[in-house]
Every structure is written in C-alpha cells, then in structure tokens.
Regions:
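Extended acidic, low-complexity intrinsically disordered regions
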Residues: 1-239
C-alpha cells in the first residue's frame, strides 16, 4: 500500500491557507519568537514540559532535579504560538517544607512573543490554588479524567520515542495499578470488592485503549502516519 499527497489536493490548499489567516487589522493570527517563563512559590518546583517547546536550560532554585520531558529549566522556547498551542507542565511538591492545608500557593506564567504586527508583547497569568490534605475529598471531586488521560498519553509517547514499546506498556500498567490502589475502595485480597468512584471510573478504560492504540502500537503503520497521530495528540487541549 502506498500513501501519497500532492500540492494540488484540496486538503493541502486548505491547510496552507489556514497558515496565513489574518485578524481584522490584517496581521497574521499567530505569534513568533516565543518564550514562556514560570515562577512559583517556594513549596513547588517545576519538573518540565511536554509540547511544541524546547528547554532553555535556565536552572535556578525553582527547578526540580527530577526532569520530565523538556526539563532542567523554568524557561522554554517556542517557534510559534497560536490559539491551539497546548503545553503540559509538570510540577513537584517540595519535600523540604510542610505546607498547611487551605493555605495558598501561586504559579505565574510569563509569556513573551513577537506579534503578527511585529510588536513585542508580554502577558502574565497568575494562578492561585489551595493546598489540601492527601485524603481530602476535594482531590476526588477535582479530578479530570480526560485531562489526566491526555497527559499520560503524552508522557507515554515521550517515553516510547526513547524506550521499547513493551517497556512503556509495562510502565502504563504499573502506573494504573498505583492509581487504582490509591483511589480505589477494596478489601485486601478480595478483587470482587474493588470499586472506583464515578470521578475515576473512566480513567482505567482510557488506559486500556491507550496501550492498544496507534500512539503506542505502531505495527502496520507508516512512520508518517505515526508522526501524524502523535502530532494531533499534541494539539489536544487539556481542559
């Protein structure tokens, strides 16, 4: 079987036209030469990022020794930025300090970019969150199964590009077992008693299909197809 695409195809023309969409003032609807910097309170450290970005290797006290994806920094570089750009950032709670439940912590995102009109812009977004205890019911009610599955898929793809697929599948299974033992209700040594609340019940199904999906199992898929599917996943919004 052969897959091919030509410059005359309607789909290619639509995609090329989309790249040059302009706003009401005639400027391109994208940003260039982008940097994203993260600063946060001392109890939180940044582990890394997954998405269309590269690490600038700017280490300081905010950066965790544990690296995930593009890590070892609190500043990342992007070639372009659009309303579909989506990056997953990973954080680690510091073990050095004991935080009080209900106290606040802050994460600030500082984005600098060159606008379509060639002006230099800077936007600052600050998010405030509350600490909760390890057994707080707010962890259960606040869990987003779809976002968690999307992030785990990105992590799995990041790993499978460096390790063997069966090793990544074993890692997914191990993480799912850890997830179930932490959030499931069960009587030890009695599998029939295992239950997950409705806020967690879909997540194991997502992992079941992920380990069998074209993102991980690339048998009978061309490198172009594999790259396409994985690129589409990187555009998924983590709502």
């Amino acid at each position: 079987m052969m897959l091919e695409e030509s410059f005359e195809s309607e789909q290619f023309k639509k995609c090329l036209h989309h790249l040059f969409n302009r706003d009401e003032e005639g400027n391109l609807k994208m940003c260039f030469d982008v940097t994203i910097e993260i600063v946060m309170t001392k109890d939180v450290k940044i582990c890394g990022a997954l998405g269309p970005c590269v690490s600038l290797q700017k280490k300081n006290s905010l950066v965790s020794e544990k690296e995930i994806g593009e890590g070892g920094t609190n500043i990342w570089k992007l070639g372009t930025l659009t309303n579909r750009t989506c990056i997953a950032f990973f954080f680690q709670v510091s073990d050095e300090q004991k935080v009080e439940p209900n106290s606040a912590f802050f994460i600030q995102f500082i984005t600098r970019y060159r606008h379509g009109n060639m002006g230099i812009w800077k936007t600052v977004t600050t998010a405030a969150r509350r600490w909760v205890g390890n057994s707080s019911p707010e962890i259960t009610t606040g869990f987003n199964q779809e976002a968690a599955a999307s992030v785990m898929t990105r992590l799995a793809i990041h790993k499978v590009e460096r390790d063997l697929a069966h090793d990544v599948i074993r890692w997914l299974d191990k993480m799912l077992i850890s997830f179930a033992s932490k959030f499931g209700d069960y009587v030890p040594e009695d599998p029939s008693t295992f239950r997950l609340s409705s806020n967690f019940s879909l997540y194991p199904q997502f992992m079941y299909y992920l380990r069998r999906s074209q993102f991980i199992d690339v048998f009978n898929s061309s490198p172009d197809e594999t790259a396409f599917f994985r690129e589409q996943l990187s555009l998924c919004l983590l709502n």
